[in-house]
Curated annotation (Swiss-Prot):
Active site: S252, D370, H398
Taxonomic lineage of the native organism: Eukaryota, Metazoa, Chordata, Craniata, Vertebrata
General function of this protein: Negatively regulates NLRP3-driven inflammation. Promotes NLRP3 degradation through the chaperone-mediated autophagy (CMA) pathway, hence attenuating inflammasome activation and IL1B secretion. Acts by recruiting palmitoyltransferase ZDHHC12 to NLRP3, facilitating NLRP3 palmitoylation and subsequent degradation.
Subunit field text: Interacts with NLRP3 (via NACHT and LLR domains); this interaction is enhanced in the presence of NLRP3 inflammasome inducers, such as ATP, nigericin, silica, or alum. Interacts with ZDHHC12. (Microbial infection) Interacts with SARS-CoV-2 nucleoprotein N; this interaction disrupts the NLRP3-ABHD8 association, enhancing NLRP3 stability, ultimately leading to increased inflammasome activation.
UniProt-listed Pfam families: Abhydrolase_1 (PF00561)
Compositional bias annotation for Basic residues: 146-156
Name listed for the protein in its UniProt record: Protein ABHD8
Length: 439
């Protein structure tokens, strides 16, 4: 089926006039998928589904105290100062009150963020950064106090002071779109349970296959699988389907693209959900990885790699998990694409400062049996982000959306419906009460 659709796309391309500008918009397939050409010759399969168009809702009633109060719902003030020091440390100061009230039943995350958070930026050589709540002068290190004070010269300071309206995203609302982005080796099929669930609730959903994955085209050039190339693909898909309030849901490597889009389009991204995405560190490929072996060697090792993924990606390794792995097209890519994807994970901008600048509310979901992403990394992400909630799933692993679909669907839906209480600084002065009529 894919070959026929792709051939049709290329025939259309060859049949266009020489002076045609811009790529082909899209081709609809008979099985409900859309093939979008994000660049000439670069075609992504996209699952775009939603409820049938309904009649326009009646206009809201005019003067109403409830409507006036509704205009203030979800309005919060985001205030934060980020200071980067020359000695490689980062100080994050939360100047306002972040809406960290209980989000979910059995919430695992902490209640209130620390007033200040001091971070040692991750060393590109591989040393892990450490988090230490405290003031600018806290922390112990080698050297005398004078040397420490001289080393703590600010390199740059970033001030964040804005108001955001964080509202409940319901399925019946036409301005809400959910974007699902998978990780390395997956496809949009890993989101089947989530896509079906949210479409039944009336949400509009968009789920692309990354290049080289699923039914998308697979260029035989390693440069086609760098982070920046894939991020531009996701930008094109986002700009095509985005509406007023967009929610990004990413898994593993897909979380990095969600972060990128949230940073690029802060006014369009309403909420973000990160599933087993790891810590807030810049991406850099490992030169000692097994994926740096020649493609022919990786091809011979593919059965072993698939078995290793089953062992590390699922809490259990029974017949059910093997079937989920097969049906979800997880870890089902060519050796060339797998090698190029792993070696192309270079994103130096995506460090702690980049994540600390985000003002969008984030739900972090972590499967406790995950052997790819330690829970400490997601905990570190929750501490860096301004508005973050961490939820741990005891029965899940790296592929938690396949293992525990009901639990994941419930968490995601509750987060979509969540709406914070407005902070005092975001509220206007109350209007004076009208004088009472004297009888």
């Amino acid at each position: 089926m894919l070959t026929g659709v792709t051939d049709g796309i290329f025939c259309c391309l060859l049949g266009t006039p020489p002076n045609a500008v811009g790529p082909l918009e899209s081709v609809e397939s008979s099985d409900g998928y859309t093939f979008v050409e994000v660049k000439p010759g670069r075609v992504l399969r996209v699952k775009h589904a939603g409820p049938a168009p309904a009649a326009a809702p009646p206009p809201p009633s005019s003067a109403s105290s409830d409507a006036a109060q509704g205009d203030l719902s979800g309005l919060v003030r985001c205030q934060r100062r980020i200071t980067v020091y020359r000695n490689g440390r980062l100080l994050v100061e939360n100047l306002g009150r972040a809406p960290r009230a209980d989000l979910l039943h059995g919430q695992n995350g902490s209640g209130e963020p620390p007033a200040a958070l001091e971070v040692e930026l991750a060393d590109p050589a591989g040393s892990d950064g450490r988090l230490a709540p405290g003031s600018a002068g806290s922390g112990s290190g080698s050297g005398s106090g004078g040397r420490r004070r001289r080393a703590r010269r600010p390199k740059r300071t970033i001030h964040i002071d804005c108001e955001k309206r964080i509202t409940s995203c319901k399925g019946a609302q036409a301005d809400v779109v959910l974007f699902f982005i998978h990780g390395v080796g997956g496809s949009l099929a890993i989101w089947k349970e989530q896509l079906d669930f949210f479409v039944r609730l009336g949400y509009e959903v968009v789920a692309p296959d990354l290049a080289g994955h699923g039914a998308s085209s697979a260029p035989q050039v390693a440069a086609a699988y760098t982070f920046y190339a894939l991020a531009e693909d996701m930008r094109a898909i986002f700009k095509r389907y985005a509406k007023k309030r967009n929610v990004l849901i990413g898994h593993s490597y897909g979380v990095s693209f969600c972060t990128f889009l949230a940073h690029e389009y802060p006014d369009l991204v309403h909420k973000v959900i990160m599933i087993n995405g790891g810590g807030p560190t810049a991406l850099e490929p490992s030169f000692c990885s097994i994926f740096n072996m020649p493609t022919c060697v990786l091809h011979c090792l593919s059965p072993c790699l698939a078995w290793s993924f089953l062992k590390a990606g699922f809490a259990r390794q029974g017949a059910k998990e093997k079937q989920l792995l097969k049906e979800g097209n997880a870890f089902n890519v060519s050796s060339f694409v797998l090698r190029a994807m792993m070696s192309g994970q270079y994103w130096p901008e995506g460090d702690e400062v980049y994540h600390a600048e985000l003002t969008v509310p984030v739900l972090l979901v972590h499967g406790m049996h995950d052997k790819f992403v330690p829970v400490e990394e997601d905990q570190r992400m929750a501490e860096i982000l301004l508005l973050a909630f961490l939820k741990l799933i005891d029965e899940g692993s790296h592929m938690v959306m396949l293992e525990c679909p009901e639990t994941v669907n419930t968490l995601l839906h509750e987060f979509l419906l969540w709406e914070p209480e407005p902070s005092p600084k975001a509220l206007p002065e109350p209007l004076p009460a009208p004088p009472e009529d004297k009888k």
